[in-house]
Amino acid sequence: MARVKRGVTTHARHKKILKLAKGYRGRAKSCYRIALQRVEKALQYAYRDRRTRKRDFRSLWIIRINAAAREHGLTYGRFMHGLTLAGIDLNRKILAEMAVNYKDDFAKLVETVSGKLAENS
């Protein structure tokens, strides 16, 4: 059986890792062993933070909706409850967008919700 030399595959693998480590500081960009560790850790952070990003954005939307609702005299919880009572099915992302960029429309929404809350209590 013929001898298999693995220089080509090893070189390709090293090159791939060093390409991923481009922009790192010190030996992490040029030394394979250190670059491998840094790249693996970076990929772990990326995996974790793709999940964290979803939570962060949801909390940001809630903060924005709460701030805008309080300007009109409602808390976030009462506002969301009122939306449910009014049968308005808007997600938090859209509500936050309205609260920041379409203040007049958001004010009308709050009026509608306030009316439903007054009816119900």
Swiss-Prot record:
* The keyword RNA-binding belongs to this UniProt entry's keyword annotation: yes
User: One GO molecular-function annotation for this sequence?
Assistant: rRNA binding
Task: State the UniProt keywords alphabetically.
Answer: Ribonucleoprotein, Ribosomal protein, RNA-binding, rRNA-binding
For this protein, the record's Gene3D superfamilies field holds: 6.10.160.10, Ribosomal protein L20
GO BP terms in the entry = ribosomal large subunit assembly; translation
Q: Record keywords: rRNA-binding included?
A: yes
Supply the PROSITE patterns for this chain.
Answer: RIBOSOMAL_L20 (PS00937)
- Which residue stretches, if any, does this entry annotate as coiled coil? none
Q: Which Pfam families match?
A: Ribosomal_L20
| InterPro entries, sorted | Ribosomal_bL20, RIBOSOMAL_L20_CS, Ribosomal_protein_bL20_C
Question: GO CC terms for this protein?
Answer: ribonucleoprotein complex; ribosome
Q: Which family does it belong to?
A: Belongs to the bacterial ribosomal protein bL20 family.
Record's function text: Binds directly to 23S ribosomal RNA and is necessary for the in vitro assembly process of the 50S ribosomal subunit. It is not involved in the protein synthesizing functions of that subunit.
What name has this protein been given in UniProt? Large ribosomal subunit protein bL20
Q: Write down the species.
A: Wolbachia sp. subsp. Drosophila simulans (strain wRi)
